[in-house]
């Protein structure tokens, strides 16, 4: 399986889980949303029912429109601006992070939502990087003579060996 296939599986799984969660939430709060919609559109419903000849129902919606709708509209406006401000702050904070940190945050979120698909993606990336590194190292190892490798190894040991002139 390729990296792109694994990546699309992760994205598909994350989106499907988010949509499923939103469906569950929507099913739970459906009555509340219906009541809010009726109150929010009460001025229009009052005019509609009055013009249709249902003056009693139009009067009920008219009283809702004058008492509850302004409060609800103010609350929804305040809530919407607060959510917009929060989302804007979160997005600008995320954008200010480095590319590696952004990748770590997104990978962590994906691992929480879709652990199996994320593990498969990480395995694919590790395998691909290992194959590429093996190909490059194998090509370089065949191109250089052996004495250069021995000299480079000796130089690395000399550079990494702790010195005996420690000043304590």
UniProtKB/Swiss-Prot annotation:
GO biological process: fusion of virus membrane with host outer membrane; symbiont entry into host cell
Subunit structure: Interacts with P3.
Purpose of the protein: Mediates the fusion with the host outer membrane during virus entry into the host cell.
Record keyword Metal-binding present: no
Annotated source species: Pseudomonas phage phi6 (Bacteriophage phi-6)
Topology within the bilayer: Multi-pass membrane protein
Protein name (Swiss-Prot/TrEMBL): Fusion protein P6
Source organism, top-level taxon: Viruses
Principal place of residence: virion
Gene: P6
Sorted UniProt keywords: Fusion of virus membrane with host membrane, Fusion of virus membrane with host outer membrane, Membrane, Transmembrane, Transmembrane helix, Viral envelope protein, Viral penetration into host cytoplasm, Virion, Virus entry into host cell
GO cellular component: membrane; viral envelope; virion membrane
């Amino acid at each position: 399986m390729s990296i792109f296939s694994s990546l699309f599986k992760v994205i598909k799984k994350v989106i499907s889980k988010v949509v499923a969660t939103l469906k569950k939430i929507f099913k739970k709060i459906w009555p509340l949303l219906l009541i809010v919609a009726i109150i929010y559109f009460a001025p229009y419903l009052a005019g509609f029912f009055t013009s249709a000849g249902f003056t009693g129902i139009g009067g009920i919606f008219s009283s809702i429109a004058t008492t509850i709708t302004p409060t609800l509209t103010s609350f929804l406006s305040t809530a919407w601006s607060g959510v917009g401000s929060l989302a804007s702050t979160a997005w600008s904070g995320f954008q200010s992070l480095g590319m590696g940190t952004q990748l770590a945050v997104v990978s962590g979120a994906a691992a929480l939502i879709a652990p199996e698909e994320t593990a498969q993606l990480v395995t694919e990336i590790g395998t691909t990087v290992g194959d590429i590194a093996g190909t490059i190292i194998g090509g370089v190892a065949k191109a250089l003579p052996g004495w250069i490798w021995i000299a480079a190894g000796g130089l690395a040991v000399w550079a990494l060996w702790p010195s005996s002139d420690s000043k304590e």
